[in-house]
Structures are given as C-alpha cells and as structure tokens.
Amino acid sequence: MAESDLATNPQATALAIILESSHTPHTLSAYRGALTPQELDAPEVETEALAFGAALHDLGWMRRVEVRGSDRFRWLSGMVTNTVNDLFPNTGAWNLVLDAQGHIQGDLTVWRGGEEQSPQRRSPVSPPRDDNGGQDKLRGTPFAGESGLQLEIASDQFDKLLAHLNKFIVMDDVELVPLDTDQVGETGSETAIGLTGPLVPEVLERVGLPVMTIPMAGTSVEWNGMDVRILRGYGVLAPQYEFWLPSAGLSKLWSFLRTGGAVPVGCAAVEAFRIAEGIPAYGIDMVERDLPQETAQMRALHFSKGCYLGQEIVERIRARGAVHRHLRPLELAGAVPPAGTELTLDDGTVAGTITSAAELPLRSGARQFALGMIRADAEAKSQSFRYKFGAAEGMASILETPPRLGKGRA
C-alpha cells in the first residue's frame, strides 16, 4: 500500500503510518480491526523479546471512550460484569458485556482516574499493594479525564459494543464520548503502544519512567511536554504495559523506549504470545453465543457488586455449579491446526473445538499452543485430545498451569 493511501486509511494505526513514512522494513496485517505491522524482525527474535526481554509493539488497535454524566458510576456498574464502584483510584478491571440472556456481547477494560471518589462506593477496598506487601508507590500524577471513568475497547468490536451500550442509556444522565481518532498529527488525537516482557521494569528504570509492581494500575507523567498515560495491564507470563499519548509524539516515544533496550515486534508475535498465555480474544475465542462461566475467565466476574444486565443467568449458573463446556488453554504436539478443528477422544467422540492456535518460535525450540472450547463430559474422561486436519494430526493437552518457556538468549 502506498504511503499516501495508508495515511488516509481509517484502519491504519498511527504507528503503521509512522513506520511507512520512515521506510522501516515491515509488513502490514489486519489485526483486531486495524492495519498494524505484522513483523518487525525475525519471528524468533520477536518471541524471545516477549518471553524473556522487553518487546515494544503497537496498541493502536485499541480505542478509548469516556463515560460522562452524573449517573455514570451507577449506569456503568449495571452494564458490565466486574466492579466499577469499588475500583480504587488509578486502577482498572477487565469486564464482559452481556445481553439479558447472559450471552457475551463483547469485552472491555474499565479504568478509573484518581481525582474523585465514586458516589456509589459501597464496600471500600484496600489500596493496591505491591509484591512486598506495601502500598505501590506510583510516580507521576493521577490520570483522569473529565469524568474519571474510561473504557478501553478493541477496534474490531468498538462500533457494535458502543451501539449496544447506548441502547441502555434511557433516562440516565450518561454520555459515551470516544476520545481518540489515531490520526498522526491531528489535534487532540491519541494512540497507544505497549511494552511486554519480564525485562520491562529494567527498561523503564533505564529511561526514567514509572515502574508499577501491581497489574491493573496506572499513572500519568509529563514527558517531552506531553501527558503520557502509563497503565500496567494483565499478563500471565510477563508484565504488560500500555502508553497512551498524543499521536504526534509517538515517533519520539517509540525511539526513546528503544534506547532503553526495548525490541520492536509485530502483531503476529503478540498474537502468538497471547495464545501461549491462554488469554482469550473476543470474536475469536469468545463469541456471542458463549456464557461467562464457559470462558473460565473468573477475573471478569464480581459476584457481590449488585445488579447488572445478564446477572440473573450468571447467578443461575453459579447456583447450579456447572456449565457443559469450558474454554481451556492447550499445548499441542503436532502441526498448528486452524481455528474450528475438532478435538476428539481416543474413541473418536467429539470433545471440543480449537478456537485459536499458534507456534511460538524459541531459541530452545518451537512450542505450539492453542485455546479450545472443551466439553465438560470429555474433560472428565481425559486431559488430552486428538486432532486432525488434512494429512496432519496431533495431540492437544490441557494446561493446568501457565507454561514454562525456559530461558532466553544469554
């Protein structure tokens, strides 16, 4: 795609446009509703950075919405599965959004700023604590927009999810305001990049940016005359950070983090690492027919927060104590199968379906991982399943704990 065409493509992320204009070698790929760099180095180099180093990558496919109005806390709490009112200032929580039948319509992360207290807060929670039992000391200042409540939504579900949420604003003093357009140089527009890997804290210390020792916490700093919002997200195998900033300053921050030792990676490696971590993506591993407990993502559910859309079904499942299938992380022995590949027991009985799969090329040898929806009755009989596609076949085994990836390059 020509540079001029890319610059006017609404799906192109700010980083994609910047790399194109700088003639940095890369390929583009559609990922989560945006055009973003697919590869920026050799696959093994990118995977090693994610697993053992500090990987720098695009998050321009994420979009933000501010929830405004005097009823914002009460209304939002009634629309999502996790706590809103009890969020500690400068923290966030991952949520599912349901319909009245309890089916998942999408997912989002709610972030609360630090400049106001929730008018609905019922059960005070302790301040987040660091790994040593003390309060996490975040350098910088609280982040907050006009309302103090913001949503992060992937581009591929943004329009649908916003339409769903807006349907339920009736007599409420609530407004959902999209905040970013991701166009380079456009006044007020913002974008995001990410840092993932066990050495991310070292990179941040090296360049003088805040390090957070707890997940789902954030702060804001002034850097090069710009406000940069730094959030630590959820990671199973490695810390994951987000940096939100004016898109006009993206090139400088990208280069600055590279001076600290961060290695640029593309979306193909990020996607493979997501699958290895066992973190589901909506529209891929979780779809509209699924119920929350079927996804086994209990970190998205809060059972004492009060009423919300779809709660009756969630509570009914909780009281019954079981669902008939679960999304499970898998390690594969064999070729990487396409999504939709059937999993079977030894006798040929269908046990489930692969929802996503990828190879993780490592210096110590390639590993294959997947996510799959497994029938509960099949899981009760076996933790390993067969699969076949074309002339290829293999075995898929449920991972009870996160995989150990070994050691990286010395």
Model-based region annotation:
Residues T109-S118, G140-P280:
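Acidic, low-complexity central loop/insert segments
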